[in-house]
Amino acid sequence: GKNACVLHYTKNNAILRSNSLLLVDAAAEYDNYASDITRTIPISGKFNEFQKKIYEIVLKAQTMAIKACKPGKTLIDIHNVAVKYITKGLIEAKILTGKLERNIKEEKYKKYYMHNTGHWLGLDVHDPSSYSNNGKPIKLKPGMIFTVEPGIYINKETGIDKGFHNIGVRIEDDILITDSGCE
């Protein structure tokens, strides 16, 4: 439901309704190292047409962002790939209007996708390592581990189809950079 639109919702006291989504952001530790995943699940067992559309946009953005994960890229590069596919999908769903490039330049997507695409993983689930060195984004190298977690969060608002109201979808996986790409 609407609580899926709240990043890191913690009250966990709402009743699950059959037409709503459950967003589960979970982590585990092994040998003092953290992991972090997120899944979005329809309570009824099946997405409605609006939920399915948003889920498919997020899944495409995540798939393409993961394909871009390789040595020499940066987390900013990965984020930009996710932003492109999120924005493209929001335009196709008629949630955003206008040209792709303009929506990206004007950051119109941020109303629905307000966080970065990922974060470092290590001894903490949000490892405090820097994203830049001397003002330059850190290039990915084999052995680095981070998350790829695009999402879309749509609260009630005028101007878009009511079927999209209160839909929050995020899909998060942990990525290891290898010599030739990622796993």
PLM feature spans:
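Active-site neighborhoods and metal-handling regions in enzymes and metal-associated proteins
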Residues: 1-183
